[in-house]
Amino acid sequence: MSGMSALELIRIVSRDSPMALAQVARVRAELAALHPRTRTEVVAVKTTGDKWMGDLSKVDGKGAFTKEVDAALLAGEADLAVHCVKDVPADRPLPAGTMFAAFLKRDDIRDALVHPGGLTLDELPPGTRIGTSSVRRVAQLAAAYPHLECVPFRGNANRRLEKLAAGEADALLLAVSGLERIGREDVITEVLEPETMMPPIGAGILALQCREGDTGLIETISELGDPGTHREATAERMFLHVLQGHCNSPIAGYARTERNGELSLRASVFTLDGKTVLNAHEWAGRLDPATLGTSVAVALLRQGARELIDDIPH
């Protein structure tokens, strides 16, 4: 490929949910700003995870949202895939022949409370039903707010808001970045700091995946990447990889680039009843991001994280 002019068309594969298509729109806009002559088109696929409304651990967990997307990439039906890092399984490598070419600048990592009556999490009365199927949220609520009740809630953010309006729960916990992507930040009652509700690994990060051999495309796409986000994603994914966490694990954590430019990683592993919480927090110092992730994972394993993770069916 001679120069970037060779890339006339980039086919982007995506789940066909409103959230996923909003993510693709961001990628197309950022590409257009850098390479106005490159056209993009969207190849939409329905994934197992989108079609299945039951328990995710029954259909390959997190992989339920990525398998069909990976297949389109490997079959050459598309050139680029957009993933939420939090939905990409870290307990196994990316499909052979594919790689992440870039991590976009990170969005808000925090969770939001949506309560039609406008109450904050601290103000919710005992017995309030919180709609969430995330073991990470269930465990943290059980630990800090045992008087609240969690009811299983699946479906995309729009669907969950509909179910809330229909009275299937009294309040919801949703990612701030997800609500922003679909233009529904108006429903947020309270934004929860990570100290209150620790986010999932990879929160608010979009990763761009392509085939390893597409050097011209990789070169183009890597220009969209954000170096700080790349370091954070690398530390977080290595952390999850060493812990061998699965989609049903109550693991939470986030890397943060401190004001002095140094990377830190804070993470926790919980029991579902919230009675046991293991914590670790380290600064990188001279360590590279992957080594930082390994170090924090090892600190949690020393505290008994393996038993907590393996106790949960997946």
Swiss-Prot record:
Documented EC number(s): 2.5.1.61
Keyword Transferase: yes
Additional remark text: The porphobilinogen subunits are added to the dipyrromethane group.
Any GO MF annotation of the entry: hydroxymethylbilane synthase activity
Protein name: Porphobilinogen deaminase 2
UniProt cofactor(s): dipyrromethane
Record-annotated disulphide pairs: none
Summary of the function given for this chain in its UniProt record: Tetrapolymerization of the monopyrrole PBG into the hydroxymethylbilane pre-uroporphyrinogen in several discrete steps.
Gene3D superfamilies the record matches: Periplasmic binding protein-like II, Porphobilinogen deaminase, C-terminal domain
Enzymatic class: transferase
GO CC terms of this entry: cytoplasm
This protein's encoding gene: hemC2
Entry-linked InterPro entries: HemC (IPR000860), Porphobilin_deaminase_cofac_BS (IPR022419), Porphobilin_deaminase_N (IPR022417), Porphobilinogen_deaminase_C (IPR022418), Porphobilinogen_deaminase_C_sf (IPR036803)
Cofactor note: Binds 1 dipyrromethane group covalently.
GO biological process, alphabetically ordered: protoporphyrinogen IX biosynthetic process
Catalytic activity, as annotated: 4 porphobilinogen + H2O = hydroxymethylbilane + 4 NH4(+)
Family: Belongs to the HMBS family.
